[in-house]
Design a protein with these regions (language model features):
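Amphipathic alpha-helical segments that line or abut small-molecule/effector binding pockets
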Residues: 16-19, 126, 130
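Residues at beta-strand starts and edge strands
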Residues: 3-5, 58, 71, 84, ...
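Short beta-strand element of the conserved SAM-dependent methyltransferase core
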Residues: 9-11, 52, 75, 90
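Glycine-rich portal/gate segments that line the openings of hydrophobic small-molecule binding cavities
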Residues: 30, 39-85, 108, 130-141
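A short, structured loop/turn motif at beta-sheet edges
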Residues: 12-16, 65-70, 89-98
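Hydrophobic ligand-binding cavity/cleft-lining segments
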Residues: 1-39
């Protein structure tokens, strides 16, 4: 079973400005209000793990499963019998940058975790992406 949610924003920020914020894992709470703290346990590269503590809920471990500098990255958390992928992508054109965040949940218990965590993620994702875009433009998140 699979569940996903998606949000995007167009910003005047350069891709490297967004990338800098994404790769500053300890600073994720600056643009994501659901994050109390986060840290990466090594370089921003495929296979590196990290820890994220949400404002509500248990601390979760994640691993970077895809890193394409200035273009995209994915961090994956494990769920019982499943996975939770946070997919971040940049697209450029017409003098702007499109910041996309997609969250995909997979596994036989998705029906349960969709209700427990998915609904909150879907609710907050548009504001998270908007704050990231404003911060990348040099504004206040």
């Amino acid at each position: 079973m699979t569940w996903s949610t998606y949000s995007a924003t167009r910003t005047r920020a350069r891709p490297e400005d967004v990338w800098r914020l994404w790769t500053d894992v300890a600073g994720w709470s600056r643009w994501d209000d659901d994050v109390a703290s986060s840290q990466l346990e090594g370089p921003f590269a495929v296979g590196t793990g990290g820890v994220l503590t949400p404002r509500s809920g248990p601390t979760i471990r994640f691993v970077l499963t895809h890193v394409e500098p200035m273009v995209a990255f994915t961090n994956r958390a494990s769920l019982p019998l499943g996975t939770l992928d946070f997919i971040h992508t940049l697209r450029t054109g017409s003098g702007s940058t499109v910041v996309e965040h997609r969250v995909e949940m997979k596994g036989p218990l998705t029906f349960l975790f969709r209700r427990l965590v998915g609904a909150g993620i879907a609710r907050s994702l548009p504001a998270v992406v908007e704050r990231l875009g404003r911060l990348a433009e040099g504004g206040v998140p």
